[in-house]
Amino acid sequence: METPLKAPEGSLGSYNEPSSCTSEQDAAAQGLVSPGDEILYQLYQPLEACDNKCYCKKCCYHCQMCFLNKGLGIWYERKGRRRRTPKKTKAHSSSASDKSISTRTGNSQPEKKQKKTLETALETIGGPGR
């Protein structure tokens, strides 16, 4: 013979007690709503999105979700990634390729020619003063 399983004495309680998932209207209809039960009902309410955009003190403490989001600044929603700016058009890079190498690199060769001409000019003048 098998014995039926008994629930432990410290389990969820008797079946006569209203559960936390019953609605407030059901609890009010039963007449079992006390201030403590109402607070517990509000505490165990599921976190639902709140459409209120106000950040005043009253609205920050409106519900647990508002407190987390507005009061503490914790957002569990997925943030959208920023999109990268599109690369510049091909016309810009093609204009750089039209220029010669010396103009893109800062005219390094013409500077060398200028230095050589200055050196030759100084030699023809007569060198140092003495």
Curated annotation (Swiss-Prot):
Post-translational modification: The phosphorylation by CDK9 does not seem to be important for transactivation function.
Cellular compartments annotated: Host nucleus, Host nucleolus
Taxonomic source organism: Human immunodeficiency virus type 2 subtype A (isolate ST)
Subunit structure: Interacts with host CCNT1. Associates with the P-TEFb complex composed at least of Tat, P-TEFb (CDK9 and CCNT1), TAR RNA, RNA Pol II. Interacts with CCNT2; the resulting complex is unable to bind to TAR RNA.
Modified residues (Phosphoserine): 94
GO cellular component: host cell nucleolus
Domain remarks: The Arg-rich RNA-binding region binds the TAR RNA. This region also mediates the nuclear localization.
Chain spans, region Disordered: 1-29, 78-130
Gene3D superfamilies per record: Tat domain
Biological process, per Gene Ontology: positive regulation of viral transcription
Protein name per its UniProtKB record: Protein Tat
Region (Core): 67-77
